[in-house]
Structures are given as structure tokens and as C-alpha cells.
Design a protein with these regions (language model features):
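Acidic/His-rich, divalent-metal-binding segments that scaffold phosphate/diphosphate chemistry
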Residues: 46-179, 186, 190-196
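Alpha-helical scaffolding flanking metal-ion-dependent phosphate/phosphodiester catalytic sites
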Residues: 124, 147-158, 176-187, 191-273, ...
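Short, contiguous strand/loop micro-motifs
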Residues: 16-19, 115, 172, 214
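Sparse recognition of residues in long alpha-helices and their boundaries
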Residues: 39, 50, 104, 140, ...
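Terminal helices and disordered tails flanking the catalytic cores of nucleotide-processing hydrolases
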Residues: 1-86, 90-91, 249-335
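Short alpha-helical linear motifs
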Residues: 111-112, 165-173, 203, 223-227, ...
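Short hydrophobic/aromatic segments of transmembrane alpha-helices and their interfaces
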Residues: 14, 139, 221-222
Length: 335
């Protein structure tokens, strides 16, 4: 709405100026332009709601650093493990600092496939760290997990760009080439003197499924590391809610529902998915809902362990916490 403060930068392509930048106050013209360009969601600053676990401007900064790291890796076929460790520590520190009963996970929407690649790594680091923290991992374990998550797709630098960013569904031969990114990624880790088995497994095995239907090896539950099982959830969720040239984004609610279904079918780790839902809720930030009072609202935060009782903003601008409201329930998702 006009007058609200944007919490993300939106641009349609690298060679065009942003429609709106982080921190800008929205004007009526900006709102109309966003609608005309098909932008469905825009995160705005909402007072009296818990700050996001990682601020959007911080995500933007980390994305640019990942972009530089991937660029260097494309030339040298190796990464500076100290740079990755520093980024990992930033993510872990922010999330641990902001981890409480009331959480707000805000992810950035990218309109460009290449930019998606970089922000996807940051999102994977954030989501994986949240799952790990909720699952009781210690700081040193979280650091390794986050490290693996923010380079889990590093091997894609060796996949031809015309295939990686093809504005269509890939054919079988092309998809086989894309699959190799996990193998390429583990090689880059070795070239970079990254020897931690947890990190290498997170990079190499994040597309494995517990029922053996994943790739590259078709490994099953007992053969897949905790790190890879966590990153798999983060990878799928962020991919589903993201715009790509060949598909539209799913709503956060639909994506969560798909994650839960994959766990029930034995593809994703059920306990880790429960930890994920515990922190992001059944109705993630950005979900539009209808209440039994007839009012419409948008989810702006969640209470850990209260998956069906998010923090909402009503159409009149009032914020309410369903965990503290008796008799008020969600009856329908409107996304």
C-alpha cells in the first residue's frame, strides 16, 4: 500500500533500474507499476511485529557476496573457504540472535534467473540454519551446515548457461547435465581444500531422497547425512516459492503443503520437516487467509510450535496474534 516501507529491491532485469529499492516509501505510481509488471508479493515493514531473522538488506548484501564468490570460482574452479566461513558465521549469528518464540522469515523475490541462483544460496543457508537450530544442533554444527548450504549449488557454474537458464522445461539429456552440478560441486570443494565430510555431503547429496529416488547415487535414508537432509528441505521450499522463467512461483502455503506431502511419502525427513514447520508455520509469512470472522489478513510472523496460529495483519492495518486470540481461526487460504 502507498506509504509503506519496502523491505526489498525489485528490478525486472540487470540492465533496468529498480522499480523500488529497500527502504523506499511506496508511492501510488510504484504500486501500480508493480501490479502492471506482474509482481504478486512485496515485503513491507510492519510495526510491532518481530523483526525478520535476517533483514532483507542483509540478504541483498550476502547475495552480492555470493555472486562475487561464484564469479571467482568460475575462473579458478575453487573457492576461498575463509570467505564462505565468514558468510556462514554472519547468517548463523543473525539467526541465533533473533531466534525466539516469535519468528518472521522473509525471503527475497527475484525476477531474474541468474540473480535467483545467488539469493537461493543465501535463502538455503537461512532456512537450513533455522531447521538445524530448531533440531538442537550446536553452533559448530550450524556453522558447517550453513557453510554447505550457501555453496550447495556451486557446481552450477560448470553447467552451460543456455541450459541452466533455459526459459522452458529441460529435456531429459539437458536435465542429466544439470544433475551433474552436485558432482561438480564436490570437486570444487576438494579443489578448495574443504575436507569436512558434512560439508561435502551437503553439497553432493542435497538432491538425494530418503526413498532412493533422488540423484546422483540414489542413496537412501541411512546413507544421507543430516546436513544433506536439511539442505534438501531448504532447497525444495525456496525453489517452489521462487519465480523462474519456466514457471510461476507457488504460494508459501502451497509450498509448505508440498513439503509435508513429500515427507509423508518418504522422500524428505519427517522429523526435520516438522522442525521446519515449527519455525515457519503451516501458514508462512506472505500467506493471505480468511478468518472465521469474515476478515481477510496476511501472515506477517509465526509463533514457534503454533503452526496453525500465525501473527496476522488485518486489512485495517491491525496486527493480531492468533495464539493469543480466543475463538478466532483461519478457515481458508486465499492465495
Amino acid at each position: 500500500m502507498p506509504g509503506e516501507i519496502s523491505m526489498e529491491t525489485v528490478r525486472l532485469s540487470d540492465d533496468q533500474p529498480p522499480i523500488v529499492r529497500i527502504g523506499q516509501s511506496l508511492t501510488e505510481d510504484m504500486v501500480e507499476t508493480l501490479k502492471e509488471k506482474g509482481v504478486r508479493y512485496l515485503w513491507v515493514q510492519i510495526s510491532s511485529v518481530k523483526p525478520p531473522v535476517v533483514k532483507p538488506e542483509k540478504i541483498e548484501q550476502l547475495k552480492e557476496e555470493i555472486k562475487d564468490i561464484f564469479g571467482d570460482a568460475a575462473e579458478k574452479l575453487r573457492v576461498d573457504r575463509r570467505e564462505i566461513a565468514n558468510l556462514s558465521h554472519e547468517i548463523v549469528n543473525d539467526i541465533v540472535k533473533n531466534y525466539s518464540d516469535k519468528l518472521s522469515l522473509i525471503l527475497l523475490i527475484q525476477q531474474n534467473d541468474e540473480e535467483y541462483t545467488y539469493v537461493h544460496e543465501v535463502h538455503a543457508g537461512m532456512i537450513s540454519t533455522l531447521i538445524g537450530l530448531e533440531s538442537g544442533l550446536k553452533i559448530n554444527q550450524l556453522s558447517r551446515l550453513s557453510f554447505a548450504a550457501i555453496i550447495h549449488d556451486i557446481g552450477k557454474i560448470l553447467v552451460p548457461k543456455d541450459i541452466l537458464y533455459a526459459p522452458r522445461r529441460l529435456n531429459e539429456k539437458e536435465f542429466e547435465l544439470v544433475k551433474k552440478h552436485v558432482e561438480y560441486g564436490s570437486r570444487i570443494c576438494e579443489n578448495s581444500d574443504i575436507r569436512d565430510p558434512e560439508i561435502i555431503s551437503g553439497v553432493r547429496d542435497h538432491h538425494e531422497k530418503l526413498d532412493g529416488t533422488g540423484y546422483l547415487k540414489g542413496s537412501k535414508k541411512g546413507e544421507i547425512s543430516l546436513e544433506a537432509r536439511i539442505i534438501a528441505i531448504a532447497d525444495v521450499y525456496d525453489a517452489l516459492i521462487s519465480n523462474r522463467s519456466y514457471k510461476s512461483s507457488w504460494s508459501p502455503y502451497r509450498a509448505i503443503s508440498e513439503i509435508i506431502k513429500m515427507a509423508s511419502f518418504g522422500k524428505l525427513d519427517r522429523e526435520l520437516v516438522q522442525a521446519f514447520v515449527s519455525v515457519v508455520g503451516l501458514y508462512p509469512v506472505g500467506t493471505t487467509v480468511l478468518l472465521n470472522s469474515g476478515e481477510k489478513a496476511i501472515v506477517v510472523g509465526n509463533t514457534r510450535g503454533r503452526a496453525t496460529q500465525p501473527i496476522l495483519r488485518l486489512d485495517n492495518g491491525e496486527n493480531i496474534d492468533l495464539a493469543e486470540e480466543k475463538g478466532l481461526t483461519i478457515v481458508q487460504v486465499l492465495d
